[in-house]
Amino acid sequence: MNIVAIISQKGGAGKTTLALNLAIASELAGFPSAIFDLDPQASSMGWKDSRVDESPAVVSLHSARISHYLETARQGGAKLVIFDTAPHSQKDALEAAQVADIILI
């Protein structure tokens, strides 16, 4: 399973848009994906709630639960996990960066 963290301290930089598009492209290519929404604004969750399709999976969580949800995603067959981080939360961004294979800034 590959893990990507999208990090920027600026709001409105396109982190959520990039996360959603990467996850959709992964799904269309046949690789199940999940988005972990670490932003309290929960824009990825809002997008998910407006959709009928169940994939890609989107989970809103706090950084303290990252390990648990990574294992759940792994057991569920996810090939790609994307962290959509908040612009103001250094702690959550750092936690995501520490477990990521790729960090997009």
Label each PLM-derived region with a short phrase.
Residues 1-105:
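P-loop NTP-binding core
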